[in-house]
């Protein structure tokens, strides 16, 4: 009951106040009051000197800043800048513009701003800025009875943003907007964020195609120059790059091209046209991807994260092409050389056999034999007669490599038999060794090279990806 009575009493008290406000607003539009407002504005501007700041010679003027971010239009890695559109508001108190008799704020034409003192605010890292002028110049001037001036502008500025692209495109960037007084030092003017944490609005509504705004920070500080100390406000945006675009446009194509280059390991090694065409195509494709990426980035002296990945993919693709070059050399290079060497050895053996079969007879009727070394120990073929027979005769006459048969003792015949047995033993050992060599895999076999490549390339490329993503993501 008591609550209902309080509400009724409050309603009765507020009703006269509302009537008074309506009457004042209505009276301001009356011709007599319009002339009074005109006289008030004329009186404020009469004798006003825009060359002097408010309270000249006294304490510094406190200028409050508010920013309503409309959009971040572009972030350029090539130019190292970003474009920002905002509603920029400044407020300060100028006692020369205080008035009485009109309990209303006076919103004046934007051209009146040219007749009033305004702070010499500028953007320190600005490259190009302009105030919008459609349909009229987008600026506002509003006066309060206590002399407070509200000055608003709609500005689009392109500000420098120095980026560290070592982790590109897995990077985060900090882009700032530096607001500073150009001529007035801290003895004449002070800047502050009007509204504290609420001085900057509209950031949460912004959506960028390649970035996400993780956080923003407002800073107020003083900077020292040779001409004095100046006030500075900083608005810093923390931008995190979205990786989805680069996965679809760069990482995935590079990975697929690298895997495609391994198809040559399953193609027959004598299909030179197919394997060479595939290898060259993959190498040129990787080169095209790298070239296109470099065109969209500045020419910086350090290596970026995406450069390391593309370089790794290019190395794997190039090694796949070199692998076939090695296989081709083994199969088509050494093969004919070995075959030619084998034919030369065979012809030399046949020539030696013909020379061994030649029989010469001297004038006395003796058989002449040239001194030849035993070429084949496994054959055991020797010119032996009457082994163990003491009557067997072989005469020897050493002159110009001529041998005559002379009688051979039983001891010499026994030694010949032992030599023949040793030759047979050596032949068996060599045949056994050749059988063992067949069981050992030949490292120059082209099929084994392709088989090892089918396992080596995917495993090493997978390890490369694991190390790369663990390092740059974390």
Curated annotation (Swiss-Prot):
Cellular component terms (Gene Ontology): chloride channel complex; GABA-A receptor complex; GABA-ergic synapse; plasma membrane; postsynaptic membrane; Schaffer collateral - CA1 synapse
Residues that coordinate or bind histamine: 122, 181-182, 227
Protein location: Postsynaptic cell membrane; Cell membrane
Catalytic activity: chloride(in) = chloride(out)
Cystine crosslinks: 161-175
Family to which the UniProt record says this protein belongs: Belongs to the ligand-gated ion channel (TC 1.A.9) family. Gamma-aminobutyric acid receptor (TC 1.A.9.5) subfamily. GABRB1 sub-subfamily.
Domain note: GABAARs subunits share a common topological structure: a peptide sequence made up of a long extracellular N-terminal, four transmembrane domains, intracellular or cytoplasmic domain located between the third and the fourth transmembrane domains.
The protein, known as: Gamma-aminobutyric acid receptor subunit beta-1
Phylogenetic lineage: Eukaryota, Metazoa, Chordata, Craniata, Vertebrata
Encoding gene per record: GABRB1
């Amino acid at each position: 009951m008591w609550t209902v009575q309080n509400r009724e009493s409050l309603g009765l008290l507020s009703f006269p106040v509302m009537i008074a406000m309506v009457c004042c607003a209505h009276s301001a539009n009356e011709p007599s009051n319009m002339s009074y407002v005109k006289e008030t504005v004329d009186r404020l501007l009469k004798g006003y000197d825009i060359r002097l700041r408010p309270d000249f010679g006294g304490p510094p003027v406190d200028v409050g800043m508010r920013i309503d971010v409309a959009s971040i239009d572009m972030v350029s890695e090539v130019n190292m800048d970003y474009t920002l559109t905002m509603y920029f508001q400044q407020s300060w108190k100028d006692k020369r513009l205080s008035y009485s008799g009109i309990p209303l704020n006076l919103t004046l034409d934007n051209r009146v701003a040219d007749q009033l003192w305004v702070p010499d605010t500028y953007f320190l890292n600005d490259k190009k800025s302009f105030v919008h002028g459609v349909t009229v110049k987008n600026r506002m001037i509003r006066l309060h009875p206590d002399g407070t001036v509200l000055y608003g502008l709609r500005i689009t500025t392109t500000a420098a943003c120095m980026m560290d692209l070592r982790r590109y495109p897995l990077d985060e960037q900090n882009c700032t907007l530096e607001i500073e007084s150009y001529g007035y030092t801290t003895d004449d003017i002070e800047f502050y964020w009007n509204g504290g944490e609420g001085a900057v609005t509209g950031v949460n509504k912004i959506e960028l195609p390649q970035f996400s705004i993780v956080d923003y920070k407002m800073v107020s500080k003083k900077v020292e120059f040779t001409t004095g100390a100046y006030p500075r406000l900083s608005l810093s945006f923390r931008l995190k790059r979205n990786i989805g675009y680069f996965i679809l446009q760069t990482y995935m194509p590079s990975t697929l091209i690298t895997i495609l280059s391994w198809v040559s390991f399953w193609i027959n090694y004598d299909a030179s046209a197919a394997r060479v065409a595939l290898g060259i195509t993959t190498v040129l494709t990787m080169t095209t991807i790298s070239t296109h990426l470099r065109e969209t980035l500045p020419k910086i002296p350090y290596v970026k994260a995406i450069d390391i990945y593309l370089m790794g993919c290019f190395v794997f693709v190039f090694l796949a092409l070199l692998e076939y070059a090695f296989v081709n050399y083994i199969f088509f290079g050494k093969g004919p050389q070995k075959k030619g060497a084998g034919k030369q050895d065979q012809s030399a053996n046949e020539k030696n056999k013909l020379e061994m079969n030649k029989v010469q007879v001297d004038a006395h009727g003796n058989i002449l034999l040239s001194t030849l070394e035993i070429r084949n120990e496994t054959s055991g073929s020797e010119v032996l007669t009457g082994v163990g027979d003491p009557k067997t005769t072989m005469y020897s006459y050493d002159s110009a490599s001529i041998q005559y048969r002379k009688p051979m003792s039983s001891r010499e015949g026994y030694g010949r038999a032992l030599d023949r047995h040793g030759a047979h033993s050596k032949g068996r050992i060599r045949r056994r060794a050749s059988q063992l060599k067949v069981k050992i895999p030949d490292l120059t076999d082209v099929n084994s090279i392709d088989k090892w490549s089918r396992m080596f390339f995917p495993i090493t490329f997978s390890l490369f990806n694991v190390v790369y993503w663990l390092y740059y993501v974390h």
